[in-house]
């Protein structure tokens, strides 16, 4: 089975329909990924068929976990080689996609991919905690997503400040997610979100790999103290036993 037919078939197994034209875009993306990976560190997965499932199909699980409104502003935090942002944009060309990463050379590669497959996306060279303090980016996205970037209590502090009221944060992770989510639940609440659901998936690979998408919705403004400095976020992450400092009335105000 060739790569395009493999993608169409495997995506169908998770309930996502990929058209031949979209499969062609994914093929170009994969070719560039594997070619550029020989000179820069983009992915540890170098087998084309494995990459189709563990990068492309895995990214597409987001479409089944979260209903994204038309023309939504979506930011992919710590996008790396473009997952899940670029697969999402291929399938949903209406969204306004922003790709955020701390390494500029990755963003150069992603701009090359976007040009090659004919999609538009904004690339931003910033650390996530810097983006969360930027008034042009803070609380301005309908959806923030991240794929296996960090533990949930750290990831939440990176991503939640970027989403607007009633927006969603979708975290994509492996089998550890349910335990991480329980541990981080109070931290997530302190940042302004409530956990809506956790959606399990089994990837259609030989290992039947287990994946989860945790969906959180923003119902309170994120207190201005978050995100903290990057070193503090990782050295002193917000734990389950977080002592929550009461925010201002504005921070507590719920959207109606």
Please place each PLM-identified region on the residue numbering.
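Class I SAM-dependent transferase core
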Residues: 3-69, 112-119
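Short loop/edge segments at beta-strand edges and connector loops
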Residues: 46, 125-127, 197-199
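Conserved SAM/SAH cofactor-binding pocket of Class I
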Residues: 60-150, 156-157
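Short "lid" loop at the C-terminus of a central beta-strand within the Rossmann-like core
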Residues: 129, 174-178
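A short glycine-rich, Lys/Arg-flanked "PGG" loop and its adjoining helix->strand segment in the class I
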Residues: 156-166
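Conserved beta-strand signature within the Rossmann-like core of class I S-adenosyl-L-methionine
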Residues: 167-173
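SAM/dcSAM-binding transferase cores
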Residues: 182-243
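Conserved small/polar residues in nucleotide/adenosyl-binding loops
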Residues: 244-251
């Amino acid at each position: 089975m060739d790569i395009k037919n493999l993608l169409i078939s495997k995506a169908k197994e998770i309930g996502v329909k990929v058209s031949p034209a979209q499969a062609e875009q994914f093929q170009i993306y994969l070719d560039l990924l594997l070619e550029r990976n020989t000179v820069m560190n983009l992915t540890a997965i170098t087998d084309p068929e494995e990459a189709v499932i563990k990068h492309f199909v895995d990214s597409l699980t987001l479409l089944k976990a979260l209903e994204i409104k038309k023309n939504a502003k979506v930011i992919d935090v710590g996008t790396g080689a473009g997952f899940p942002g670029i697969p999402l944009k291929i399938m949903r060309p209406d969204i306004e996609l922003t790709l955020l990463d701390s390494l500029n050379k990755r963003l150069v590669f992603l701009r090359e991919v976007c040009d090659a497959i004919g999609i538009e996306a904004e690339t931003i060279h910033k650390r996530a905690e810097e983006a969360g303090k930027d008034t042009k980016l803070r609380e301005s996205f309908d959806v923030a997503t991240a794929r296996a970037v960090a533990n949930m209590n750290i990831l939440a502090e990176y991503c939640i400040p970027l989403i607007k009221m009633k927006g969603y944060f979708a975290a994509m992770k492996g089998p550890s997610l349910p335990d991480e989510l329980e541990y981080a639940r109070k931290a997530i609440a302190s940042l302004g979100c409530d956990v809506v659901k956790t959606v399990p998936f089994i990837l259609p690979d030989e290992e039947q790999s287990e994946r989860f998408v945790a969906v959180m919705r923003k119902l309170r403004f994120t207190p201005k103290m978050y995100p903290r400095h990057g070193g503090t976020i990782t050295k002193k992450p917000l734990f389950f036993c977080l002592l929550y400092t009461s925010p201002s009335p504005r921070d507590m105000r719920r959207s109606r």
